[in-house]
Amino acid sequence: MEEEVAALVIDNGSGMCKAGFAGDDAPRAVFPSIVGRPRHQGVMVGMGQKDSYVGDEAQSKRGILTLKYPIEHGIVTNWDDMEKIWHHTFYNELRVAPEEHPVLLTEAPLNPKANREKMTQIMFETFNAPAFYVSIQAVLSLYASGRTTGIVMDSGDGVTHTVPIYEGFSLPHAILRLDLAGRDLTDCLIKNLTERGYSFTTTAEREIVRDIKEKLCYVALDFEQEMQTAAQSSALEKSYELPDGQVITIGNERFRAPEALFQPAFLGLESAGIHETTYNSIYKCDLDIRRDLYGNVVLSGGTTMFPGIADRMQKELTSLSPSSMKVKIVAPPERKYSVWIGGSILASLSTFQNLWCSKQEYDESGPGIVHRKCF
């Protein structure tokens, strides 16, 4: 491996794909993880209609397309579409030849072994990567925060995980997964807005609601209190202009949707909220390391970007934990991209260069090599 070839770092999330070069401080390309196919037969010859669109292009033509997400709940479910996304990443977004750069991909905690092998196979056989590595998302977020011990509460668009990490190793027995994340909150907001008389049904309209969520929603420190405030005055109301110029007003929906993170019953789910899940995850760890975990609760992922979430998390976790424990919530401002940033740090370390899984090793041992090299 010569020094000058930068590794490519690709963080494939359920909602967004983040890609760029190792050593950079932010991803060059961030685009939706979607593949769209035309709903209707094209009538105008020579319009150059493609049979599929990826990312932003699919997003901008969403009115005429059926959109599919190849990654559900953090795990790849549709490999053909996933290949399209990777192809788009290399050739259209980063404009690089994948056969010239080592590739670092990220995976969800507890990703099935077969998936990991399939990823490896596609990178080496379809894209001819010279070297490859796959790393667990939460571990990278922790690296990005400059720690080697802590518990990461990583919540993206499709899935939320709590991952305790001690001295750089994740503790699989204590990892908890919660199928409640950004996409569900968008659904929750759609439901709340429908009660107000605004209807959003198509995949395209759903993207509008996602934007409303990202711009206007926040987490209340005290939900009941906030509901009373909202009922008594219009101070919490905000307006939002839809693409067609219509203006809608949104009040208590602003904090009712994100509240589902702490009270999943709002979505009809029987699971524990993110605060309880974090607590349960810590509780599954050895007594001796719990203090270190409580003192380093790192938030990561786009769904942790709601204003007020860190304070609320601090409050809820403090009330669950033993009184002698000092709870510290770490919410880095760049946490939306901290998985990618961690990958960028890792792939550019000189000590990491001999950990890559090379094409030669793959040719000798097959996809199973990934379990021996990447852990």
UniProtKB/Swiss-Prot annotation:
SUPFAM superfamilies referenced in this protein's UniProt entry, alphabetically: Actin-like ATPase domain (SSF53067)
EC number(s) recorded for this UniProt protein: 3.6.4.-
GO CC aspect terms: cytoplasm; cytoskeleton
UniProt xrefs under InterPro entries: Actin, Actin/actin-like_CS, Actin_CS, ATPase_NBD
Subcellular location per the Swiss-Prot or TrEMBL entry: Cytoplasm, Cytoskeleton
Keyword list, A-Z: ATP-binding, Cytoplasm, Cytoskeleton, Hydrolase, Nucleotide-binding
Highest rank taxon of the organism: Eukaryota
The keyword Flavoprotein appears for this protein: no
Catalyzed chemical reaction(s): ATP + H2O = ADP + phosphate + H(+)
One GO MF term: ATP binding
Family statement drawn from the similarity comment of this UniProt entry: Belongs to the actin family.
Function, in words: Actins are highly conserved proteins that are involved in various types of cell motility and are ubiquitously expressed in all eukaryotic cells.
Protein name as annotated: Actin-2
Annotated source species: Suillus bovinus
